[in-house]
């Protein structure tokens, strides 16, 4: 799914060059469940933005499903984002007056899909996150974990090749975080490619592979077991 070769990203901050990424070589295969972890300033958010086609690198190549996206125009990137990537953020970004079902349908509304097919696919997505019994509830009638599951269903409804989650448990307590991690594990178990960005080792340890960034470079790239042993988890 993902191959990066020598990815670099620099910013000019008032005349000072900040090197956020200094040469990232990373390959993520279809059906992998990978966490990208690092402290503030490590470059993980910059890498997430590039993987998510929200930003482009200054140097190196980024290939997504055989397409070199690192040199695409903004319009081309937008098309790739809509087709290939489902985003999950720590702020759920749900419409407060819309039901769970309608929130999940929204990307398909923008895609111009007919109402019957939209409804069918939204129900399927809610079933994948075990929330079909709450589809007529509005966000204020749902718990934090249920809201995040609606957001995950919305990210899945377009059948993306990759689910990209940015600090998906950042607004949740530890018990609810475990609930959301189980959702990701179930999705990964059914063949969904999942890439999760986090700064929390105990959350990263739920992934099958953990890539740790430090100072814009890959510091370690471990299996779940090796990462857990390294961090005493």
Model-derived features: where do they sit?
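ABC family nucleotide-binding domain
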Residues: 1-218
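Conserved beta-strand-loop-alpha-helix hinge in the C-terminal portion
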Residues: 217-233
